[in-house]
């Protein structure tokens, strides 16, 4: 899917290739083989949908892993400086195939922004007019779902755990912001 995403905006940039290598943590002795697979995938006429369905089946019910895959795809799309509309559409379609709701997708997308640009309510899957109690419940739910220790206990790949740590930072930052906003 990373090959298809890299190609969807018309060209595969050097930055996107570096991002794929960085996020997938490819061992040095396998880079050539993975490169061949990547090149073949980006040139194939087959769309990304079969790959997305395959991943959705493999990780059926493991929302944490599926959300982290979306995070990794955003990381790759962002690596060349901007996320094109075609890249965004593709990532959104993959999220739908994974069974993620629009609220979950928007939360992931929002958490990709730098902390000073985050909308804390979107990150916490809530609205500004929700009570602090409702937002706190969502915060606790998201914290539990994305906690790196939980993912480690499930044996997920390290890159998924790393993305989970970044997501937790966004969740915690959003909660801090909401507490400040609601106390005023």
Predicted segments with their positions:
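Small-residue-enriched hydrophobic alpha-helices in membranes
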Residues: 1-7, 11-184
């Amino acid at each position: 899917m990373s090959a298809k995403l890299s190609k969807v905006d018309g060209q595969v940039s050097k930055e996107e290739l570096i991002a794929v290598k960085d996020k997938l943590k490819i061992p040095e002795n396998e880079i050539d083989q993975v490169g061949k697979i990547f090149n073949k995938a980006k040139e194939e006429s087959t769309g990304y949908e079969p790959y997305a369905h395959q991943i959705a089946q493999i990780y059926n019910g493991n929302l944490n892993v599926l959300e982290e895959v979306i995070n990794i795809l955003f990381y790759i799309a962002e690596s060349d400086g901007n996320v094109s509309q075609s890249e965004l559409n593709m990532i959104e379609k993959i999220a739908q195939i994974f069974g993620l709701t629009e609220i979950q997708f928007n939360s992931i997308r929002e958490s990709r922004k730098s902390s000073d640009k985050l909308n804390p309510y979107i990150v916490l899957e809530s609205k500004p007019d929700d009570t602090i109690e409702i937002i706190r419940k969502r915060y606790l739910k998201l914290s539990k779902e994305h906690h790196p220790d939980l993912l480690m206990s499930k044996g997920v790949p390290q890159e998924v755990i790393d993305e989970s740590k970044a997501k937790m930072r966004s969740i915690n930052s959003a909660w801090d912001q909401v507490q400040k906003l609601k106390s005023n």
